[in-house]
Curated annotation (Swiss-Prot):
Entries under Pfam families matching the protein: SVWC (PF15430)
Keywords: Disulfide bond, Secreted, Signal, Toxin
Note: Negative results: this recombinant protein is not able to act on sodium channels (Nav).
The protein, known as: Venom peptide HsVx1
Gene source species: Heterometrus spinifer (Asia giant forest scorpion)
Family: Belongs to the scorpion La1-like peptide family.
Lineage: Eukaryota, Metazoa, Ecdysozoa, Arthropoda, Chelicerata
Length: 97
């Protein structure tokens, strides 16, 4: 019985280590291997596995609701994510930047 337990443990470990091996996500004609990221304009893509499925995660700037006394300042369009995203500056804190 202990040999069976060792064999099952070995196979489960091997499967966990090879999940997603050789697989990739497609983004605009290029492939991102599982476990890697790709920077593109103001987006960051990550190819990952989730419950034995290959998934593509995309991070991009969120729209912000600007409160009274604050203003939105555009980010540098040539900067990598998240430095390309706009920031919110408010009176009394960072207004004079």
């Amino acid at each position: 019985m202990s040999h069976l337990r060792i064999a099952v443990t070995f196979l489960c470990t091997l499967f966990a280590l090879t999940a997603g091996a050789g697989e990739s996500c497609q983004v605009g004609g290029s492939a991102i291997p599982v476990g890697k990221t790709k920077q593109e304009l103001c987006n960051l893509y990550e190819c990952a596995t989730d419950s034995n499925r290959v998934v593509l995660k995309k991070l991009t700037c969120a729209e912000q609701a600007v409160k009274t006394g604050c203003r939105s300042v555009p980010g540098d369009a040539n900067a990598p994510f998240p430095d390309c995203c706009p920031t919110t500056l408010c009176r009394g804190r960072q207004w004079d930047h």
